[in-house]
Amino acid sequence: MANWHEWAELLERVREENPLVHNITNVVVTNWTANGLLALGASPVMAYAKEEVGEMAKLAGALVLNIGTLNDKEVEAMLVAGQAANEAGVPVIFDPVGAGATRYRTETARRIAEQVKLAVIRGNAAEIANMIGEAWTIKGVDAGGGSGDRVALAKRAAEQLGAVVAITGKEDVVADGQTTYLIQNGHPLLTKVTGAGCLLTSVIGAFAAVERDAAAAAVAALVYYGVAAEQAAAKAGERGPGSFQTAFLDALAYTSVDDVKRHGRVEQR
């Protein structure tokens, strides 16, 4: 695909194909993630048992791994599912929630990246930096006050990790090691909704299920998500984060390809 305007049409493909997205995600965001994927037009499944995750991953259009509330049992299930997805050619999307906050969390994120071929890694700057051994402060599972060139960081991480890297924040950055995209859509109220980033990772999974160009899938998903947030804020943002969350779920359903093309703000470098 030639440019992001064409990639925006992936939204229609997601809604037409209704891809199955297998999520091994955290307990905080499971319901929100499932509802968000349904609103988008994808079909979510949450399967965690090591005894079935390999089989389920092979049935899915994409596998999403999220270490937000990790434990040894779940990590082993992620590795089984990830390796099964690799065998079946199913793209694996990874959210290294809180990498850098604790040694266990950081080591787990790196272990998954080493043992599973990842298509896209989506995180904040601190999480991505800590995955490649660079210093960047982190507060709990949120990026701290670290300073640095996020564009350069995304490029380095993509090269070192062998995956498309999406660093999200006030401005989103997507890098595949050769080309970098800056996305300027979104709204500050997303930071007031628990699991907004986790749902975004699963939305990337839905787009990756219908488009094997991982960079295209990531850019299209981020622009769509950001435009939906802007539309939700315009309708309900003044009433606060609760009203925004409801409006955002609606916006995920009604935001169109034309909306994305009209309101998307993407710079290619």
Curated annotation (Swiss-Prot):
Transmembrane regions listed in the UniProt entry: none
UniProt entry keywords in alphabetical sequence: ATP-binding, Kinase, Magnesium, Metal-binding, Nucleotide-binding, Thiamine biosynthesis, Transferase
Catalytic activity entry: 5-(2-hydroxyethyl)-4-methylthiazole + ATP = 4-methyl-5-(2-phosphooxyethyl)-thiazole + ADP + H(+)
Known role: Catalyzes the phosphorylation of the hydroxyl group of 4-methyl-5-beta-hydroxyethylthiazole (THZ).
Keyword Magnesium: yes
Family per record: Belongs to the Thz kinase family.
Protein name, as recorded: Hydroxyethylthiazole kinase
UniProt GO molecular function: ATP binding; hydroxyethylthiazole kinase activity; magnesium ion binding
Positions in coiled-coil regions: none
One BP term from GO: thiamine diphosphate biosynthetic process
Keyword Nucleotide-binding: yes
Binding site for substrate: M46, G195
CDD domains in UniProt: THZ_kinase
Enzyme Commission code(s) on record: 2.7.1.50
